[in-house]
Amino acid sequence: MNAVGIEVSKGKSMVAIMRPFGEIVSAPFEIKHTAGDIHSLVELINSVEGESRIVMEHTGRYYEVLAHQLSKANLFVSAINPKLIKDFDNDSLRKVKSDKADAVKIARYALDKWQNLKQYNVMDELRNQLKTMNRQFGFYMKHKTAMKNNLIGILDQTYPGVNTYFDSPARSDGSQKWVDFASTYWHVDCVRKMSLNAFIDHYQNWCKRKKYNFSQSKAEEIYGKAKELVPVLPKDAITKLIIKQAVYQLNSASTTVESLRTLMNETASKLPEYPVVMAMKGVGTSLGSQLMAEIGDVSRFTHKSAITAFAGVDPGVNESGSYEQKSVPTSKRGSSDLRKTLFQVMDVLIKTHPQDDPVYQFLDKKRAQGKPYYVYMTAGANKFLRIYYGRVKEYLSSLPES
């Protein structure tokens, strides 16, 4: 029974090997994340008599190299939430923070939780890919929003309000009607310098070329508004270049977002719980894949309260003696990305109001009681996660073992 504790950092790690009752098999030593050092570590672990289990914190992306390579060497590897390691065995007044001390602490954690350690496996790699894509998706969504606001800010000086003319959703290639329109009619003079009939013909040809729906009443409305607008920047080559560059940057970010959205759905469809998640109300191919990316493997949660605590939407408790606080904020100690996705799901439910859905019924009930927005949204997210946990776990248990 050998516990291998690994304190992972960027490019290198500290390793300690222990046995029960504090027996030190190998004092903490450093290895580089190179093929040679990892091979030497595998040989050392295999040379130690008895069963060995390796535990490391899943800190950022640093641990993945070791977890992957050690798993390929047929060793038992378990990646643990750093919060669990931090809170483990804090029974000393001394505060020691070093890689060597942390490696020993992780090894002691492995010994204490020996029977409950979950092995890192190939499915975890697929989920890690999905989670990485989701984080990239979030990054590019923020970038897209910044580029969109930048373009609108410039257009307010050449064609105010043009971004409000169309509300069509983005296409699969990331293009949007208002952006394409602003790219062609980048200045208000591009519209009002033409006659009404000339603009209608030009706009109709543009819609046909770009494969958008044409409406004559919309064309007349656009032309009428253009007559009243007052631009700030002149209609010249410099202004056109500024706008074209802003449009290009927005289209580039939007294309990346949509390609990631498609790839995430394709990856999520390989997970066993995909059909169950897609069948839930408020969830589509985009939010569904984001949920699966952030929640991960449901089987690692022992009960419903564990998954709500992981998301940070579990109700807080503040009691001491005879004092008991009635309204306590949620813990918010879990994944902020998961909470964001859950709030988006709740928003979809409120907008679509499926009357037969228990989560929507719960949300509607809390709203009718006059609960504040964040209270009923968080409560709905909590209920949704509990239902998610129950349905997915029941479905996974019904599948034949592979």
Describe every region a protein language model picked out.
Residues 1-402:
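A detector of single, family-specific signature residues
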